[in-house]
Each structure stands twice: as structure tokens, then as C-alpha cells.
Amino acid sequence: MAAKEVKFGNTARQKMLKGVNILADSVKVTLGPKGRNVVLDKSYGSPVITKDGVSVAKEIELEDKFENMGAQMVKEVASKANDEAGDGTTTATVLAQAIVNEGLKSVAAGMNPMDLKRGIDKAVIAAVEELKKISQPCADSKAIAQVATISANADHTIGEIIAQAMDKVGQEGVITVEEGQALTDELDVVEGMQFDRGYLSPYFINNQESGSVELDNPFILLIDKKISNIRELLPVLEGVSKAGKPLLIIAEDVEGEALATLVVNNMRGIVKVAAVKAPGFGDRRKAMLQDIAVLTGGTVVSEEIGMELEKTQLEDLGTAKRVVITKDNTTVVDGNGDDTAIDGRVNQIKQQMEDTTSDYDREKLQERLAKLAGGVAVIKVGAATEMEMKEKKARVEDALHATRAAVEEGVVPGGGVALVRAASKLAELRGDNEEQNVGIRLALRAMEAPLRQIAMNAGAEGSVVANNVRAGEGNYGYNAGNDTYGDMLEMGILDPTKVTRSALQFAASVGALMITTEAMIADIPQDDNAGGMPGGDMGGMGGMGGMM
């Protein structure tokens, strides 16, 4: 085991503070509409230019082990805020830096760190309640566009396109962000349920122009096993043929004799039919088949529930207004499922999303939810260069997360005003002793830090702006974009309540832990030269010639 170096008390805290300040100073320059860019060197390819706080934080690794510990703890604040609300990483970092700097001054002056921590916790709990009181619902398209614009660093085109996407697919719908091919941003909307499986044979194609299969008012057979024997399918094919409607088969696979017979029947016009593989694998495939069944009003033919393909009736088949199948995708439009059953399925998936601990599972459940409840919108980001594309795509993703957070918990005045208002309401808050009171005042003072930093990045004097905003009431605040004061909501400067709340809670949590640090332990750096192989021994290799 490697030898360790241990630092205690103020020496340890000062080292940690230095790391905190290096990381926070690098991140906080990006805050606000006049925030600056940070250039990140990459070992491969061109440098990356970003205004995304968490991207900057992730790049920072310090040589000194003790300083690095401080930096990594603040990096955790940014990551947690990003995971919880998808935005607010820079605000969280600025708050954490302010709490740690103020807190360590008080500890150095001889105050009890544990009482300071209790005071900070008390102030944050009260501030979160105040934020909830001043929060307003964010329901209309205009407010959504404003939130997205602010999060995308005042880019109105991004705000508008996200608002359009939410209008089209609803608040439950899935919105994905991709790199586009054009110079401008584009929005593609897929209505109905789409999954990434195409036709099993090109002989099913009936629209030669688009190279797709189009079925109007088809029956839909859902089965969770492979079909290779055509005899199993004959009763269904006969029933569908008599009804004079097309048939879509969604199965684990259709192969051999069964597929060949379907192709021949389709080409001869005996029955209009197409087959695709079921989406997903394993348990996820079963769940998605059940989703399609609920959406189309059908039943999944499964031996697990005692159903056999030979005994399947027309009543067991789902129906939809239209199905379009391309080489890669199948889209079911206007399934004829029962609305109550669909709502029940949606609620079931929402419950699973709450229960799961896996981010991957949650993402897949969100996709399934969107396909049932709304639709899928794809924002294709346009830019002139690859460097600009990457930077812009990151901003669009941030804006999308912020918008979802706003819809979830509402909005508060932006530009750091909400935290200033919450702090001013808590001027009378008291702890159990004087040191807790210092902790409370310390946290309330730190809550002004984001506003001061936004002003400083815009070239204004932070203290003057903070005093002017404190003198106002309600939504009155400072618009750093054009250096004016006024009603933040009327000027369209909004922050999602969830983003502001998460930033404050995570910053206070980690900041208070750092204040209470009394010892730090790290590996002693190894001297690389000391471990080198002695050069003299290799001389003996010359004698190997005598072996020949």
C-alpha cells in the first residue's frame, strides 16, 4: 500500500479552498447572457469552445492532490445539479464557492463548523420554501420559449424551436437532439408510434416512389415468437382476406416457408400483408409489444398466457388508421385502442420511471411513454462548422432540460433575482445560538453571488447591482443583456424553479461538508526516476552471442 500524506485543520482547508477557487473561477465566467467562452484543449481533433458550466468543470484535474480534492467536490455539485435538473450547473458552482469561502473565514475565526453547517441547512430549507411561494406555473408556449432562450444563452432561435417541438408532441413527448446537415435548425415530428424495425422483405413494398409499405386501416397481429410454419397463420390470413383489409404482422421473426408464402400471397393480391420484427429484445420486447397492443386495441398472442396462433380470432387483432413501413422504421398512426387502457398504461410506465434507479432504463421508459402519450420530435441542429455544431448542440440539450424542469415545477424571476428575494424574506430567521445565526447569514449572503457574477460578467459593478435589486420588490431585477432594470417576467427572463432549487440545495450540501473538514489524506506522489531499471545489468546481454 502506498504511503499517505495527511494534512490537518487550517492547512488542509486552505489547500482545499485553493482547488475550489480554481475550478469555480474557470466555470463562473460563463454565467449569464454576457458570459464568456472557455476553450478546452482535446488530445484529438480541434479545441472545443463552450459556455456550458458542467463541460468546463469536467475538464479540470489539478496536479496537487489536496487542491484537486477541493476541485472534485465542487465538480460533484455541478454534476448533481446537471443530473437533477439538466441545467443550473454554473449557478450551483458559484453558490458553492461563496458558501465555502465565507464559511472557512468563520471557521478560521474560531467558530464551531458544525453549528455553521446547521445554520446553513436551516437557511436553505427556508429559502426553498420561499422559492416555491414565488414560483409561477409555466404552461403556455411563450413562457416555454422564454425559458429555453435564457438557458441557451439568449439564443432566440433555439427557444422558438423547442417551444414548437413541445407544442407538437406535448409535454410528455420525446424530443431528441441530433446533428443536422444544413446551416439552419430543423424540426422533424413523427406522429403516432414509431419503432426502429423495417419490412422483412422488399417484396412487401407497395409505394415504389417512396420505397415504403403503406397500409390503410390494417389489422395488426402481435406475436412474441418466431413464425416459420405457414399452417399456424392460415386461420388468421383467411379471416383477414374475407374482411378485405390489409394485415401487418409484428413478430419476433418471420422466416422460411412462412415469409415466402406471405410474399407470394401479397404479390398475387390474395391478401395485402406485410411483416416486421418486434422492436427491442427480451423483456423490453414483451413490454413494447404490449404497448402496441394497448395502442391498437389488440392482444399479444403469447403461449405464456395460453394463446395459440392457430386459434387466434379477428377480435384478438389490433387496428389502426394507417401504417407506414420503410427499410428502417415502422410507424403506426391513430391506433384504435381504448383511451382508458392507454391512460392506464401511461400511468403504469410513469410509476416504473419513478421506481427505477437506472438512467438507461428511465430513458427507455420515457421513450415508450412518449410513443403512447404524444409523439417524437427531432431537433436537427444546423451550423457552419463542426466546432460550432458541438457547442450549439450542447446548448440546445441544456435548454431542453431547463424547459422540462420549468414545466414540472414552474418558473421564478431569472438573473439571480429569485434567490435575492428569497434571502431578503429570511432576514429575521434565527438559529439556536449565535454561531448558527452566522451560518444563516453566511448562506443568505452567498445567495446574492449569482446575481453579482452575472453583473460582473456583463461589465457592471456587482455590489451596485445587488444593492439596486435588493431595494426593489417582487420581480424587479437587472437585465444583463441590455444593462437595464425592470420586471424580469415581463422582460422574459425566467429560470425554472427546479433548476434554482437544485443548485441551492446541492451547493449548500457540499459546501457545508467542506466547511466541516478537519483532515485530508492523499497518496504521496511517487518519484518516477527512483523506480527506473538500473542500466548496468543489461550489459550482460552481450554475452548471449556465445550461446549460438
Swiss-Prot record:
In short, the EC number is 5.6.1.7
Gene3D superfamilies, A to Z: GroEL, GroEL-like equatorial domain, TCP-1-like chaperonin intermediate domain
Q: Which family does it belong to?
A: Belongs to the chaperonin (HSP60) family.
Q: Which GO terms describe its cellular component?
A: cytoplasm
The protein's GO terms of the molecular function aspect are:
ATP binding; ATP-dependent protein folding chaperone; isomerase activity; unfolded protein binding
Recorded catalytic activity of this chain's protein: ATP + H2O + a folded polypeptide = ADP + phosphate + an unfolded polypeptide
The record's subunit annotation is: Forms a cylinder of 14 subunits composed of two heptameric rings stacked back-to-back. Interacts with the co-chaperonin GroES.
What organism does the UniProt record list as the source?
Idiomarina loihiensis (strain ATCC BAA-735 / DSM 15497 / L2-TR)
Q: Which residues bind ATP?
A: T30, L31, G32, P33, K51, D87, G88, T89, T90, T91, G415, D495
Name the HAMAP family for this protein. CH60
Compartments, as annotated in UniProt: Cytoplasm
GO biological process annotation, one example:
protein refolding
According to UniProt, the name of this protein is Chaperonin GroEL
